Amino acid sequence: MKAQLFTLLAAAAVGTGTVQARGEYAEIARLRSMNETVRGIRSMADGEHYTILEGNNIVRYGYATAGQGEQMLPKPTANLVVTDYAFSPDERQILIASGARPIYRHSYTTDYFLASGNSLMPVLREAEAPRDASFSPDGKLIAYSDRNDLYVYDTAGKRTRRITDDGAWNSVIN
């Protein structure tokens, strides 16, 4: 009788462990199948805020606070369609890509705007087909490509300097 009781208890314990292990495995498999990143959220340098593109505006939220976010752009502009954006290293300026025109696969040219304080102004206007613009580490310059040549735009002096002159379509890509 004791042997049968012991066998019954041992079988129940082993069975419970198997069911529990299956449940844990199912939970692990479920978690692994989830996305590994959260698209659209960009963490800010202070570690306390993040931004999201909502409609045609960039909105800043706090991780620890709920509620309405702070709009980062001065005011909506009719000809501005925000397709991408990047903050300067000090996060005082925002480089905005607007109106992407596809080239091939994931490549595109676009118009660029610079938001700083309460102003929003077009930049890189003399460029024929600007693309891949980004801030320099000090935030004073914007580097970009135009017709496969590299350029640097000075945000303070509003002047462009050509860096390369050997770019050619489908031949030399700088």
Regions of interest found by a model, annotated:
Residues 8-18:
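Hydrophobic h-region of N-terminal signal peptides that target proteins for export
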Residues 17-174:
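Beta-propeller folds
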Residues 1-6:
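Bacterial N-terminal signal peptides that target proteins for export
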